[in-house]
């Protein structure tokens, strides 16, 4: 009789961080656990060796994602985050490195082929360079796009706009022209408001109104006097009866 094994349950983090930090040794710059995730920061130049160790010796077989984060105030403003999954242990771990605009991060396409597209995405959106990636082209933005749109200093409006020109009968690119500077408005979420509000974001009281506008009848809304008579007719309490043919069609 065949024995059916269920999928492994979500593994506990107990002891995992200590084991991995010990295995990675001097490569580790910092480690912590947050929101149930183990996060290990390592030296940038060691990222390939670190991920190879996690894949080959600790069963993190899959590279699920590579993400970028921008912290403009830091000397090395970018973080590159690698998210690994162990199928056999049903466990995840995140590994991070930091870099700046000019210093490349070693590619991990030597370990996972899918890293090629993931590294291209981080390059396209943040401008992070990956040494050894032989196809480091843009992957999400349009041809001829300038800049990296996920950087914190990239304007929300962008630099160019795309529209269809009736005169030229084609799509054209033009520099963004704003009649006034872009303004952003903070609105409180109906589910989770900010507590306390940001300075200057306090809500103002409504000004007093001496003669409030009220509507006594439909004509006050601009619908005209005939709207009063139509409203007075009302609607029948019961819907009109359908004949047999209409009932059959229904």
From Swiss-Prot:
Residues 193-250 are annotated as: Disordered. GO terms for molecular function: NADH dehydrogenase (ubiquinone) activity; NADH:ubiquinone reductase (non-electrogenic) activity; quinone binding. Keywords: Cell inner membrane, Cell membrane, Membrane, NAD, Quinone, Translocase, Transport, Ubiquinone. Gene3D superfamilies: NADH:ubiquinone oxidoreductase, 30kDa subunit. Residues 241-250 have a biased composition (Acidic residues). NDH-1 is composed of 14 different subunits. Subunits NuoB, C, D, E, F, and G constitute the peripheral sector of the complex. HAMAP family: NDH1_NuoC. This is NADH-quinone oxidoreductase subunit C. It comes from Erythrobacter litoralis (strain HTCC2594). The gene is nuoC.
């Amino acid at each position: 009789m065949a024995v059916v094994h269920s999928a492994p349950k979500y593994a506990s983090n107990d002891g995992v961080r200590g084991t991995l930090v010990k295995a990675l040794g001097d490569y580790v710059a910092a480690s912590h656990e947050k929101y149930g995730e183990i996060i290990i920061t390592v030296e940038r130049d060691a990222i390939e060796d670190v991920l190879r160790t996690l894949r080959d010796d600790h069963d993190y077989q899959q590279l699920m994602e590579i993400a970028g984060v921008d912290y403009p105030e830091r000397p090395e403003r970018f973080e590159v985050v690698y998210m690994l999954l162990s199928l056999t242990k049903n466990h995840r771990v995140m590994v991070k490195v930091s870099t700046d605009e000019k210093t490349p991060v070693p590619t991990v396409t030597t370990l996972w082929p899918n890293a090629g597209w993931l590294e291209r995405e981080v390059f396209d959106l943040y401008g992070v360079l990956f040494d050894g990636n032989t196809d480091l082209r843009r992957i999400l933005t349009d041809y001829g796009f300038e800049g990296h749109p996920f950087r914190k200093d990239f304007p929300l409006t962008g630099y160019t706009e795309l529209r269809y020109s009736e005169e030229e009968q084609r799509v054209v690119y033009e520099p963004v022209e704003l009649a006034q500077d872009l303004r952003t408005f903070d609105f409180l979420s109906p589910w989770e408001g900010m507590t306390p509000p940001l300075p200057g974001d306090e809500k103002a009281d409504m000004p007093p109104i001496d003669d409030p506008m009220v509507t006594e009848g439909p004509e006050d809304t601009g619908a005209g006097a005939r709207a009063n008579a139509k409203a007075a007719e009302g609607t029948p309490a019961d819907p009109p009866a359908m004949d047999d043919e209409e009932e059959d069609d229904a």
